[in-house]
């Protein structure tokens, strides 16, 4: 099975759930950029302090800072990894690639979890988050598609993209992902 992976997909497609399962089953390091940021901030590392200052101003953490945090995690990593939540744009992907090349850890596969909007909206509303109403969700899906479409094309052109239909049980989706990575 391929060992250096990216997960892409719209909000509600099950990326986090499937990433956790795959990482546990194959001893991959799960690199969720949101979790990494929170860990760095909590540990009060220099990168974490820089990220905290930005987040406390209500701003988005820069691509450069996220890349530095990802690099920090990967430079001591000998085994496989799954990057979840980054890159989200083509610009981020093009910044990530030289770093991975330098570390001699190129991406081996990109898993795109796809699901129709009706199911995504239903899943997100059922989570019960206060900001998950239908109009907000539709807007998030539109932003996702706008930002991610060029990224999907980029990985498709590189021959890395594996598309998996994320409809069905957690187990059946996990099996489809596993098959796509062999």
Curated annotation (Swiss-Prot):
An example Gene Ontology biological process: AMP salvage
GO cellular component: cytoplasm
Residues noted as binding AMP in the record, renumbered to the chain: 33, 38, 59-61, 85-88, 92, 129, 140
Residues given in the record as ATP binding sites: 12-17, 127, 168
Pathway listed: Purine metabolism; AMP biosynthesis via salvage pathway; AMP from ADP: step 1/1
Reaction equations catalysed: AMP + ATP = 2 ADP
CDD domains, sorted: ADK (cd01428)
Stretch list, region NMP: 32-61
Keyword vocabulary terms for this entry: ATP-binding, Cytoplasm, Kinase, Nucleotide biosynthesis, Nucleotide-binding, Transferase
Places the protein is found: Cytoplasm
E.C. number(s) listed in UniProt: 2.7.4.3
Primary location group: cytoplasm
GO molecular function: adenylate kinase activity; ATP binding
Region feature LID, mapped onto this chain: 126-132
Alphabetical list of Gene3D superfamilies matching this protein: P-loop containing nucleotide triphosphate hydrolases
Matches recorded under HAMAP family: Adenylate_kinase_Adk
Subunit field text: Monomer.
Family per similarity comment: Belongs to the adenylate kinase family.
Free-text comment on this protein's domains from its UniProt entry: Consists of three domains, a large central CORE domain and two small peripheral domains, NMPbind and LID, which undergo movements during catalysis. The LID domain closes over the site of phosphoryl transfer upon ATP binding. Assembling and dissambling the active center during each catalytic cycle provides an effective means to prevent ATP hydrolysis.
Role, per record: Catalyzes the reversible transfer of the terminal phosphate group between ATP and AMP. Plays an important role in cellular energy homeostasis and in adenine nucleotide metabolism.
Listed name of the protein: Adenylate kinase
Organism: Prochlorococcus marinus (strain MIT 9313)
